[in-house]
UniProtKB/Swiss-Prot annotation:
Name of the featured protein: DNA integrity scanning protein DisA
Organism: Acidothermus cellulolyticus (strain ATCC 43068 / DSM 8971 / 11B)
Family: Belongs to the DisA family.
GO biological process, one term: DNA repair
Binding site residues for ATP: 82, 100, 113-117
UniProt GO MF annotations: adenylate cyclase activity; ATP binding; diadenylate cyclase activity; DNA binding
Domain of life: Bacteria
């Protein structure tokens, strides 16, 4: 695949800045109330979210205010037809009735005067710029060369609910394949395919959840219930991504060894088409390609040890380092477990009983 087809890290940064700006103007904020008032009053507006020497250099006229932002005041200032300059947090009004003179050589795809000025100002200064169109009755946000039109909360909520239904189906399938993998790990019957399927499903769940999180940000106070539902569905998913890689990533070989973070970044960088290919997923997690999918592989035991209540991460690391594989852990007696640093008799019994319970429940879930 061509390098320019892959997600760029600069795009990731742009997404984060757009999301942060959307949070500052989401429903429930003074800024969003101000924008709604301007729109309802059939008035246009040009608002810059930030002020520095670059912004100052393209400002002409207007007057200084430096007062706390309020929706009624913003509505009145918008009637003057000049641009309004706010601080970066969108909590204070710095200047009003300003004539912006951005570099006319900066390319823009907009046709309206206000929108052209907004896009050029955003590109030249690096600050987000909001344009409220009087004729089209839309609110457009310009951030890092992107244009984002604010939708009605009802439309966003409709899309979010569809995405949430998809996430529920994805999570159900993830639970199924994860349970199957646990049973296969206990029986020492895992193949590369089994591990790759779980890694694939975890990444698919993470991606749809990230999309929903964007809707939560854009909905502001209207997205509280959606946020609670998302948190409930995602409980334990992020740690599971880390654990599946720790279990199956081959041991580092000198300087060429890849870290868990490297693998997670590579999974994140896969295109949707690549993510559907189990061979590609297997290659990313270090288990070879399509030709190796049916090869047997043994986990280290991170996933199952993490399911034992009140077992610290440091102890899990020492147990895995000492025994090396899950099968050796399962075969270990209480005395064997006590030989590990930081594991006393009480904890050794807890680990032994926990592994036995997990083995029993995993087998029952698979065959009963």
């Amino acid at each position: 695949m061509a390098a320019n087809d892959r997600p760029d890290r600069s795009d990731r940064g742009a997404d984060e800045r757009l999301r942060a700006t959307l949070a500052a103007i989401a429903p429930g904020t003074q800024m969003r109330d101000a924008l709604e008032r301007i729109l309802r009053g059939n008035t246009g507006a040009l608002i810059v979210l930030g002020y520095d020497k670059t912004v100052e250099s393209i400002c002409s006229g207007g007057f200084n205010l430096d007062v706390e932002l309020s929706a009624p005041l913003m509505r009145e200032l918008a009637k003057m037809d000049g641009a309004i300059i706010l601080d970066e947090k969108a909590t204070r009004i710095i200047k009003a009735n300003v004539h912006l003179q951005p570099d006319p050589s900066i390319p823009t795809n907009e046709s309206g005067t206000r929108h052209r000025s907004a896009e050029r100002t955003a590109r030249q200064t690096g600050f987000p710029v909001i344009s409220v169109s009087q004729s089209m009755r839309i609110i457009a946000l310009y951030v890092d060369g992107r244009r984002h039109v604010l939708d009605e909360p009802s439309a966003i909520l409709s899309r979010a609910n569809q995405a949430l239904a998809t996430l529920e189906r994805y999570k159900l399938r993830l639970d199924e394949v994860s349970g199957t993998l646990s049973a296969l790990e206990i029986e020492d019957l895992v193949t590369v395919r089994d591990a790759a399927v779980v890694a694939q499903r975890l990444e698919m769940v993470r991606r749809i959840a990230d999309e929903i999180q964007g809707y939560v940000v854009e909905l502001g106070t209207d997205g509280r219930l959606l946020s609670l539902q998302l948190d409930e569905l995602l409980a334990g998913v992020e740690p599971e991504r880390d654990l599946i890689v720790r279990d199956y990533l081959p041991a580092a070989a000198g300087k060429r060894g890849r870290s868990v973070d490297d693998v997670l970044r590579d999974l994140d960088a896969l295109t949707p088409e690549e993510l559907l290919d189990l061979g590609t997923v297997a290659r990313v997690i270090g288990c070879g390609g399509t030709e190796n999918l049916d090869n047997p592989v043994s986990p280290r035991g991170y996933r199952l040890l993490a399911k034992i209540p009140r077992l610290p991460c440091a102890v899990i690391e020492r147990l895995v380092e000492h025994f090396g594989t899950l099968q050796k852990l399962l075969a270990a007696s209480v005395d064997d477990l006590q030989a590990v640093e930081g594991v006393g008799e009480s904890r050794a019994r807890s680990v032994r009983e926990g592994l036995s319970r997990l083995a029993e429940s995993s087998i029952l879930e698979r065959y009963v």
